[in-house]
């Protein structure tokens, strides 16, 4: 199975995970966005949009990570979450 197939399988697995911490959800979100869209673009949402600002900040931490690196990190994270 190539990396793209592993990534797609991990996305499906992640949807079936039990409830996760906000930190873990932001990590999954940021890796997914970096893998599928690349570096974050545009301005951060208003500080009053706490959820949007947190998502933007999490994605920003992945700046410079290649699509393949982000996919692999996502696959690894989902594997850790489903193993335990």
Regions found by a protein language model. Give the residues of each.
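A charge-rich, low-complexity, intrinsically flexible signal that marks solvent-exposed coils, linkers
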Residues: 1-84
């Amino acid at each position: 199975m190539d990396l793209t197939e592993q990534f797609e399988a991990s996305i499906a697995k992640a949807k079936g995970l039990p409830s996760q911490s906000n930190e873990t959800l932001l990590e999954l979100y940021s890796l997914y966005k970096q893998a599928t869209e690349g570096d974050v673009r545009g301005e951060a949402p208003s500080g009053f949009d706490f959820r949007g600002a947190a998502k933007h900040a999490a994605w920003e931490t992945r700046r410079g990570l290649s699509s393949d690196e982000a996919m692999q990190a996502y696959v690894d994270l989902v594997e850790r979450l489903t193993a335990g």
